[in-house]
Amino acid sequence: MRFSQLYAPTLRENPADAEIPSQALLQRAGFIRKIAAGVYTYLPLARRTLLKIENIVREEMDRIGAQEILMPIIQPAELWIKSGRWDDYGPEMMKLKDRHNRDFTLGPTHEELVTELVKNELNSYKQLPVTLYQIANKYRDEIRPRFGVLRAREFIMKDAYSFHDSWESLDEVYKKFKEAYSRILERIGLRYTVIEASSGAIGGKESHEFVAFAEYGESNILYCDCGYAGSDEKVPYMGEYEVFDEDEKERELVHTPNVRTVEEVAQYLGVEIKRIVKSLIFKGRDGYVMVLVPGNRELNFEKLKAYLGDQSLQMALPENILEDFGVPIGFLGPVGISNVKIVADKGIKYMKNFVVGGMKKNYHYINVNLERDFQVEEWADLVVVNPGEPCPVCGKPLKSERGIELGHIFKLGTKYSETMDVKYMNKDGKMKPFIMGCYGWGISRTLGAIVEQLHDDNGIIWPVSVAPYEVVITVVGKENEKSFAEKLYRYLLDKGVDVLIDDRDVSPGVKFKDADLIGFPLRITIGKSYKDGKVELKERVGNVTIIEADEEVILKNVQHILKR
């Protein structure tokens, strides 16, 4: 390809809406253009890199026996209603109606569709296991699309689904996917970790995330020197709970005008934040639930949804709270509330004489105690675990680092096959629901994650395995230099090198800056040293080699550098 013909409009300044390096660099380097919030067009350079990422993923899927298919983006609502996720999935699901007023969704994932697909095709244990996968666009109506392609509303994903007649068979395939995903990351060249994770809206028995480390990653990874690593959505709290060893005092309702937040209440009443209990109201498929957590701890919403088994759970709106309870948000509490399930974090078991909302505007209760003043229906671990708190494996202090989730694998079990009544005949002639697994990989997220992890002040640093072009030939001389550059370009092409020649009529400075910005792994400069029979090879990370201006010598050096 000739740079003079390449559609790669580079920018000299960062876009105004760019929040993180990858979002800025992919636009500046001419890889993507924003069409709407969370919606991007991938330009030729990005498409080349995406295809290379896809090919690595495809090779690893084929290696473990997965078979590629392609399913429709649009899915009928009946499948999702049947599985129970039409309402559970939440507002991220993009719903629409056709001209006949039938409900559809733009698929955020394909568990329902693939389960229905095999319903009348896989009917005997002799046909199992089977693993199917696709690489296709997905749609999720993110409440706040941000960070460019890392959290987009339309994105490219590889999703795979396996069907089994035993848990042992699922375990075997699950292990193969763990190994395949690790190979994908190693082939691309990213620093990563594998963590225990929450199953979220997908559901299932067990799940793991594959996370690339990045300063601006959305995932907070807690890890330990012993080898343990987990998402902060999943890590259990293993610290000690503070025991309030004191006598119970008489409960009082005190006036707290315009005091709503934990910090304001603590300051107004002159108490420590740890003596306050936060009362949070959520609404799910079974109605309202009140959740209690210590004032000095943060609620882990993913733990709460997993514990209640309700992915539709949402924080109740202030106007609904006022209408249904007659109390403004900020003054809710467990004392005197009725017809609401109360779930509390385990840390509250050991508290005495604490502060809660007074169920009356501008009032709080002090000296509240369990059993005497209210009852908790269920106890659970509901708080966010912080760095420095004990590792659940060895007890040593946890450390933290941010990362970007690229892959997520799940042991679904019979979650979908049972609800959708999809069965096979086992060895004993009995009809049984399939045991399933699902395995996602963010293709377009990988594009952003690579840039997020591998860049410098000058631009992107593409690994050779996924660079849009491995080599750029930069001509900065006159006719003799141009003639040799053309000859070298054709020679390298014939030898299978993925090469671009920068034949534009622009200054050498512009060519060098664009080469660094775009991030080609290797630049061959044919310039002033050519008169002495030399050319310059410069790696993107800085190593410079002056070699003989001979095609075979150059090819040998190029191949050696690209294989390192």
From Swiss-Prot:
Disulfide-linked positions? none
**SUPFAM superfamilies according to UniProt:** Class II aaRS ABD-related, Class II aaRS and biotin synthetases, YbaK/ProRS associated domain
Please cite one Gene Ontology biological process associated with this protein. Answer: prolyl-tRNA aminoacylation
Keyword annotations of the record? Aminoacyl-tRNA synthetase, ATP-binding, Cytoplasm, Ligase, Nucleotide-binding, Protein biosynthesis
Question: Which interval of the chain is the signal sequence?
Answer: none
E.C. code: 6.1.1.15
Supply the HAMAP family for this chain: Pro_tRNA_synth_type1
Q: How does it assemble?
A: Homodimer.
Q: Which PANTHER family match?
A: MITOCHONDRIAL RIBOSOME PROTEIN L39/PROLYL-TRNA LIGASE FAMILY MEMBER, PROLINE--TRNA LIGASE
Q: What is this protein called?
A: Proline--tRNA ligase
> Which gene is the coding source of this polypeptide chain?
proS
